[in-house]
Regions:
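A short SAM/SAH-binding and catalytic strip from SAM-dependent methyltransferases
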Residues: 139-160
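Conserved class I S-adenosyl-L-methionine
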Residues: 155, 182-199
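SAM cofactor-binding core of SAM-dependent methyltransferases
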Residues: 60, 69-128
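Conserved beta-strand signature within the Rossmann-like core of class I S-adenosyl-L-methionine
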Residues: 175-183
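S-adenosyl-L-methionine
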Residues: 1-72, 80-87
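A short acidic, Gly/Pro-enriched loop at the edge of an enzyme's catalytic core
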Residues: 131-141
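Class I S-adenosyl-L-methionine
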Residues: 194, 199-282
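A short glycine-rich, Lys/Arg-flanked "PGG" loop and its adjoining helix->strand segment in the class I
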Residues: 161-175
Length: 282
């Protein structure tokens, strides 16, 4: 049986993003050009311009000029959260993975403007970054805050946090690594909780907490808040069906600032679900 080439594998895997255009407006292009090879990683591409060429690696100690704890954020957007974290934690190095070029350009410009030397931006597919640029056991924390929920049933195969991704995350995290997640879409939160909890590579330090009446999931189901926030007809569940007896939701991560995106979600009446998982001993 013939094995798939890297090109074939990349095109067969459902992507968690859709790029509609690579064009940047002039101000973003200037920011991109100024940051490329500095704050913005210059990486040779594979089958797509979001993939990494086979065999290419980065020595992160050399890249940052030191040995330090490493935090990776996937889906950094324009960088509100990671720039704040980097400024507050100069002793830690950060990699911001943002597949959309306008966001990556804005983030790189923000890093340069704020004089942050401990952040690098990777405008790449997150799966490619985990598979090819991050050695096993090299990441102290992995952050995924408000990934695209792909809320239509036919698109859910595109969601980033699935069974296959969980083991990729496990590989790159240190034996004491932390995985922090947040979403404002209830069924994606349930999916995250389910697939990560099912892995022997992780355990939930908040197991059983925030269950029952105080669970954000119970609250969403009782009011069908997901539908309400979109202006759709609501179908609240009866109390017995709405009750989340499992819980396991984490308290809000104190270092996660409220971004413009999250504020819009709150204004629309959505609930935020936080999850924290710790790497199990190998």
């Amino acid at each position: 049986m013939r094995s798939l080439t890297e090109h074939q594998q990349h095109y067969r895997r459902p992507l968690s993003f859709v790029r509609r255009s690579n064009r940047l407006k002039p101000s973003y292009q200037r920011a991109w050009d100024a940051a490329l090879g500095n704050e913005l990683l210059e990486v040779p591409h594979g089958a797509r311009d979001t993939s990494v060429a086979e065999g290419f690696t980065i020595d992160w100690r050399e890249e940052f000029g030191r040995t330090a704890p490493l935090i990776v954020e996937i889906g950094s957007g324009s960088g509100e959260a990671i720039a704040h974290a980097a400024a507050s934690n100069p002793e830690t190095d950060f990699i911001a993975v943002e597949v959309y070029r306008p966001g990556a350009a804005q983030l790189a410009a923000r890093i340069r403007r704020e004089g942050l030397s401990n952040v690098r931006v990777a405008c790449l597919d997150a799966v490619e970054v985990l598979d090819k640029l991050l050695p096993a056991g090299s990441v102290d924390e992995l952050w995924i805050f408000f990934p695209d929920p792909w809320h239509k049933a036919k698109h859910r195969k595109r969601r980033l946090v699935q069974e296959s991704f969980v083991e990729k995350a496990a590989r790159v995290l240190t034996p004491t690594g932390v995985w922090r997640l947040a979403t404002d879409w209830s069924d994606y939160a349930v999916q995250m909780r389910r697939v990560i909890s099912a892995s022997a590579s992780f355990w939930n330090p908040h197991l059983g907490q925030r269950a029952g009446d105080i669970s954000p999931l119970t609250q969403v189901r009782l009011g069908d808040l997901d539908a309400a926030s979109l202006g759709k007809e609501t179908h609240p569940l009866p109390y017995e069906q709405a009750l989340d007896t499992e819980g396991g939701w984490a308290p809000r991560f104190a270092a996660r600032v409220t971004t413009d995106f999250e504020q819009k979600s709150v204004t629309a009446g959505r609930r935020t679900f936080d999850l924290t998982f710790l790497r199990s001993a190998r």
